């Protein structure tokens, strides 16, 4: 990739005029073929790999030539041959064509995103989802409104081609892309439907289409939002006197004009903050009521006219932070009013000011998560633990490992919430369900299982709190841990239980609009 970039410095038009010959490079398909055999980059089951023994690069080139012919367009996504062996061979070649197309288009896209996006006002993307929460903790308390938008994942093929045509002028390379997209759209399974482009589609081709489309939207929207702000994203947490000044300005005494030498101005600095995870993008706005109304009116129009994002009403939600809370990333996001006492001593006088500051307070949805555990047969609908019968065929270590993994991931993900008391209720459900599962497997009772296994039963499982419960940490440290946030930087995606609850919340909003 670096070699491509060095060559691009010498000739800036290489990525626009010389993409099509790369389709016929056998090395690209050899890379995909090796990954396909290893099962590392293909979504097909491993039992289908055995039919790829007679792989021919010449056949792949012929298929590419057939894509160029509109009258003899091949069906890439639907195979009508009843022979399963022939169908698997066809599927392997079609997947190779798509993989080659993806690899070729990824070369200029990767270089463009790497060397241009990071240079736009130091805007960078993070790998850990928990990198979003410190940002929210710093920016949300100083915002008035938020606009929560779910990016549409049904896009017309021609819109995708237009986004590529903005930075690729190589018409022969765009022609196969257009043919593939329309071939997929006109298949019997997707007739009269748009292209499904979303991170939930687990193929490299559609993941690339999704990343490219989102990048095109954000590369224009994010710099525009930054230019619309008068100030950079700064924290006002270290300026309590400014808050005190804004509070007292409401009760200021108006002097006569002849006695006042200067005018007092109370300026509110507008700021707009943006973050996205998956298909959800949130814009937090701080400013006057007029600015908020303008943003709520112009942003949907801007998306529709420039990006062709025709969002349904239920996919766009706007509300005031101080009065409502929103559900995102598996949390209830809200702003909690926190009293702050400031004492100022000047000579022999002591001034005390009572301030009210906003604090970012994400809430863990305990009751919905318990409902999800009941759906997975860890407990009943009232939260009473039951045995996981489907795991009784596993070994004791596997059972302990699975329960431990569920609790550890859940505790890691929700460790940034202040109110973690509800998490220990979930811990109780999982620990007792683990004991009942082992007792059901050995056809005994929980007391007998604990007596036979002794302290080794829960030595490995549910040990995340050792950093708080171990002797080196005092009770004060344990109490302090309840008031501190711990955002882990090794969480690449949303917790499965939190993600399931978030989908249920989105479905409820969609049903409200349908009614």
Swiss-Prot record:
Which compartments is it annotated to reside in?
A: Plastid, Chloroplast
List the InterPro entries hit by this protein, alphabetically: Domain_X, Maturase_MatK, Maturase_MatK_N
Question: Which keywords, in A-to-Z order, does the entry hold?
Answer: Chloroplast, mRNA processing, Plastid, RNA-binding, tRNA processing
User: GO BP, one example?
Assistant: mRNA processing
Which sequence ranges form a coiled-coil region, renumbered to this chain? none
Q: Which domain of life is it from?
A: Eukaryota
Give the record's GO CC terms. chloroplast
- Among the Pfam families in the record, one is Intron_maturas2
- Which GO-annotated molecular functions does the record name? RNA binding
Keyword Chloroplast appears in the UniProt entry: yes
* Family as reported in the entry's similarity comment: Belongs to the intron maturase 2 family. MatK subfamily.
Task: Give the function comment from the record.
Answer: Usually encoded in the trnK tRNA gene intron. Probably assists in splicing its own and other chloroplast group II introns.
Q: What is this protein called?
A: Maturase K
Q: Which organism is it from?
A: Larix laricina (Tamarack)
Q: Which gene encodes it?
A: matK
């Amino acid at each position: 990739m670096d070699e491509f970039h060095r060559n691009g410095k010498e000739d800036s038009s290489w990525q626009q005029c010389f993409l099509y010959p790369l389709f016929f490079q056998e090395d690209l398909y050899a890379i995909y073929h090796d990954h396909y055999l290893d099962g590392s980059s293909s979504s097909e089951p491993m039992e289908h790999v055995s039919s790829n023994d007679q792989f021919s690069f010449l056949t792949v080139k012929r298929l590419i030539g057939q894509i160029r012919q509109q009258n003899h367009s091949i069906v890439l996504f639907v195979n009508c041959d009843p022979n399963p062996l022939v169908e698997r061979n066809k599927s392997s070649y079609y997947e190779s064509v798509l993989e080659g197309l993806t690899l070729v288009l990824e070369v200029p896209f990767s270089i463009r995103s790497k060397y241009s996006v990071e240079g736009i006002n130091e805007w960078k993307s993070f790998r850990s989802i928990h990198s979003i929460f410190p940002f929210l903790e710093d920016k949300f308390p100083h915002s008035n409104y938020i606009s929560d938008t779910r990016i549409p994942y049904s896009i017309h093929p021609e819109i995708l081609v237009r986004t590529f045509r903005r930075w690729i002028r190589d018409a022969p390379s765009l022609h196969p892309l257009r043919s593939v997209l329309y071939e997929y759209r006109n298949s019997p399974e997707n007739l009269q439907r748009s292209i499904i482009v979303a991170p939930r589609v687990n193929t490299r081709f559609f993941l690339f289409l999704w990343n490219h489309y989102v990048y095109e939207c954000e590369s224009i929207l994010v710099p525009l939002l930054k230019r619309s702000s008068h100030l950079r994203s700064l924290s006002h947490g270290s300026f309590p006197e400014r808050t005190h000044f804004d509070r007292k300005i409401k009760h200021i005494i108006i002097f006569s004009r002849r006695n006042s030498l200067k005018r007092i101005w109370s300026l509110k600095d507008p700021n707009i903050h943006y973050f996205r995870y998956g298909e959800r993008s949130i814009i937090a706005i701080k400013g006057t009521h007029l600015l908020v109304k303008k943003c709520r009116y112009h942003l949907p129009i801007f998306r529709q006219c420039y990006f062709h994002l025709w969002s349904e009403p239920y996919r766009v939600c706007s509300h005031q932070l101080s009065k409502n809370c929103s559900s995102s990333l598996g949390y209830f996001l809200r702003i909690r009013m926190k009293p702050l006492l400031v004492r100022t001593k000047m000579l022999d006088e002591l001034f005390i000011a009572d301030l009210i500051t906003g604090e970012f307070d994400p809430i863990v949805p305990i009751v919905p998560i318990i409902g999800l555990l009941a759906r997975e047969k860890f407990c009943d609908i009232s939260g009473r633990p039951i045995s996981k019968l489907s795991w009784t065929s596993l070994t004791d270590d596997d059972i302990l490992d699975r329960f431990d993994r569920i609790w550890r991931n859940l505790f890691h993900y929700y460790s940034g919430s202040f109110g973690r008391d509800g998490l220990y209720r979930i811990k109780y459900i999982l620990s007792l369900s683990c004991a009942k599962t082992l007792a059901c497997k050995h056809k005994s009772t929980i007391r007998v299982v604990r007596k036979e296994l002794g302290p080794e039963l829960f030595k490995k499982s549910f040990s995340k709190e050792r950093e708080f419960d171990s002797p080196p940490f005092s009770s004060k440290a344990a109490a302090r841990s309840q008031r501190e946030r711990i955002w882990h930087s090794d969480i690449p995606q949303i917790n499965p239980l939190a993600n399931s609850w978030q989908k249920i919340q989105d479905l409820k909003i969609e049903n409200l609009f349908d009614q």
